[in-house]
Design a protein with these regions (language model features):
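Long C-terminal appendages of very large multidomain proteins
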Residues: 1-148
Length: 148
């Protein structure tokens, strides 16, 4: 067995992502088992998109390279309104998940989800960031409408 295969085997036994996999993968600090679950979720999201068309909301943290997705949104907006892409800036609106309905998706831009914030929480009633609850470091953000 080669040294590389031995290293991969050791990583698998230690529940770590093997170095050759990590070189061609998205960044992850998760142990191997959680990494595989996460990767399967990403593949299911992409497969559903391919088979059923664009979703009404996009799992932003499920993308390997989010910058290309955001650039694609800008390109679509620029083509639709014949505007130079470098003149387009982002605005956003944090949605209230209690009343949010994506329907067919955003007319322009995209609804996104899957973002987390550290050391604070989103107060839907006030529409702003608040102190986090005791002993809670990360909180999930509601859907966000990215508007070019």
């Amino acid at each position: 067995m080669s040294a590389e295969l031995e290293e991969i085997g050791s990583s698998l036994i230690d529940n770590k992502i093997p170095a050759p996999w990590a070189k061609v993968s998205y960044p992850s600090m998760k142990p191997l088992a959680a990494y595989i679950v996460d990767m399967v979720e990403r593949l299911v999201f992409m497969k559903k998109w391919i088979e059923e068309g664009a979703p009404s909301t996009f799992w932003l943290s499920g993308f390997f390279f989010t910058q290309s997705f955001l650039t694609g949104l800008k390109q679509n907006f620029a083509r639709k309104y014949t505007i130079a892409i470098d003149l387009i800036a982002w605005d956003y609106e944090v949605m209230n998940d209690a009343t949010f309905n994506a329907g067919e998706g955003a007319e322009d831009g995209a609804y996104i989800y899957g973002l987390f914030i550290e050391g604070c929480r989103w107060d839907a009633d006030q529409g702003c960031l608040e102190e986090s609850q005791p002993k809670i470091l990360y909180t999930k953000m509601p859907h966000i409408w990215l508007k070019p």
